[in-house]
Amino acid sequence: MKIDKDSPIYRLRHSLAHILAQAVLQIRPDAKMGFGPPVENGFYYDFDFGASPITENDLKDIQKRMIKIINQKQEFSEGFKSLEEAEALLAETDQSYKIEYAKELVETGKAENGQLGFYVNGPFIDMCEGPHLAHTGEVARGCFKLDKIAGSYWRGDEKRPMLTRIYGLAFEDKAALLDFQERRRLAEQRDHRKLGAELDIYAIDDEVGSGLPLWLPNGTILRDELEAWAKEVEFQAGYKRVSTPVITKSELYYRSGHLPYYKDAMFPPMKCDEDEEYYLRPMNCPHHHKVYASRPRSYRDLPFRLAEYGNNFRYERRGSLSGLLRVRAMCMNDAHIYCENDQVREEFHSIIKMYHDYYTHLRFADFRVCLSLHDPASDKFVGDQEEWERSEQIVREILQEAKIDFDEERGEAAFYGPKMDIQVRNLIGREETVSTCQLDFVMAERFDLEYTSRDGEAKRPYIIHRAPLSTHERFISFLIEFYGGAFPTWMSPNQVSIIPVGEHVADYAHEIHALLTSKLIRSEVDDSSAGFGKRVRNAIVSKTPNMWIIGGDEAESRSITWRRYSVKDQPTLPLDKAIDALLTMRSERMMDNFADVNIPV
């Protein structure tokens, strides 16, 4: 999340970054400074310590020095220097990274009138545009804590030096800091990388490659259930399903603009067919445009809705890869709608309703909507400025008509059109884009897509790109953390653990398993040699949504005692009614992982 530069929290975190750098230079005056910005939840500063980097053992001493600087109430004052003056000042302490950046700011015209901003507090001076607190004493007692050390390439370039990044947490007061630390502790327990391994959902193998997850049987069930749901929803909404190849000749991507606009996120080309270049596809869009173009279209065909769970491949730097959240191979809940100009609003509203229905059903509540706009000053966007403004206004008005609160973010649009992004927050408030919907006014022209209008004229369709359930990888990573691995019955890899209290009822337990299997309900019998309590504990640890306990009374009356995950009530039900209840929970996709949802009997 971007922080408002005029906000008090921005000033606090930015000032603490400077105080951190000042404290570090007290113990390591030879350190070279990189960047030190405020960020979500705190701040960081990058340093080059040469051959002797600091460790996390040094953080305690650095923090003590920061507190001393805070207690001195050093005033922050702003000044400006020419490039020549800045170079001379920075050269005194061999701040080569700062000198490089100073030259860049002047050469690119980003330094107003060629003047570079500097801030001074006490004996410390740093090139900076601010803003800051009035003085260091305005930092509230106990509101910050140095957090960790990580590596970071200078300017994010793997070919440049590796710097040491010191992270700090900072909030308006001590209570807010402690609250964040507690929420982070809970989030670490729910981390999808941790639970993904514990629950056998996915694996990453070095020989397979970084960012290329192996979906294990349990994870594949999660994928299959989400995909089945999406296919039902899309069928009812009039979508037609297609399947398209994952590699494509380079000509297609030059036509679409992915080459060159998206080239940095694509894998290198493959040479074949007498040196023709093929690429792994980063997106499904060009293939769907070719499906549309495969035969003449009329206004009677529109809206023409194409859907595919398509496999995509995008090059992400190794350092940015993270579990399922950031990967190099992904499968997207993708669709493209080709429609007339006067159908755009209705289609967009239908998509918004689809998103709302998904999110409401899954009980997502903590999210915000962003209208992502182009940046007229950037060359990474294609198309006419007037058309950009018209398309952006269309999406803006649609969101207003839907009575959706939204933020506008300049420069975050797709290269071919504005988009609506859904930013979902996790336990610690970190935001990730989970879903997106884009209005495209460029690709119909690039691909020469047409339809015959009512008056017999050839016209260009508008294209809407949408992916409400994101990629399997990103969406499931979020579901794991949101539910803490405790999925609803319809989605859960093992829907029922059948636990006989002893060998004398094992046959009845296996009979139940066979009955459930015949109904396509996933179940397992735990009749291992472990004690009954241990077997119950195993089912809880694996977060199985339902345990059916089988004792002598249950076997005699052909019933089960039903224990749900994290629910105290344990009713005893006739077997046939229990199976009917499970079938209802599955068919209605009930969110029974929430305690307020009762067994439908």
Descriptions of predicted regions:
Residues M1-R11, A23, R28, K32-P38, ...:
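Auxiliary tRNA-acceptor-end handling modules of aminoacyl-tRNA synthetases
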Residues P37-F43, K81-L90, I201-E207, T244-R255, ...:
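A glycine-rich phosphate-binding loop feature that marks nucleotide/adenosyl-phosphate handling sites
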Residues F47-F49, N57, R363-I394, S492-E511, ...:
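Conserved, charged catalytic cores of large soluble enzymes
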Residues Q72-V120, M266, L362-C437:
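Metal-assisted phosphate- and nucleotidyl-transfer catalytic regions
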Residues D275-E277, P286-H287, V291-R295, F304, ...:
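A translation/RNA-centric and nucleic-acid-associated enzymatic feature enriched
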Residues N312-I398:
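Extended, charged alpha-beta segments that form solvent-exposed binding/catalytic grooves
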Residues G484-R535:
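Generic long, charged, amphipathic alpha-helical segments
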Residues L516-A578, L582:
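C-terminal structured "cap/appendage" subdomains that terminate the fold
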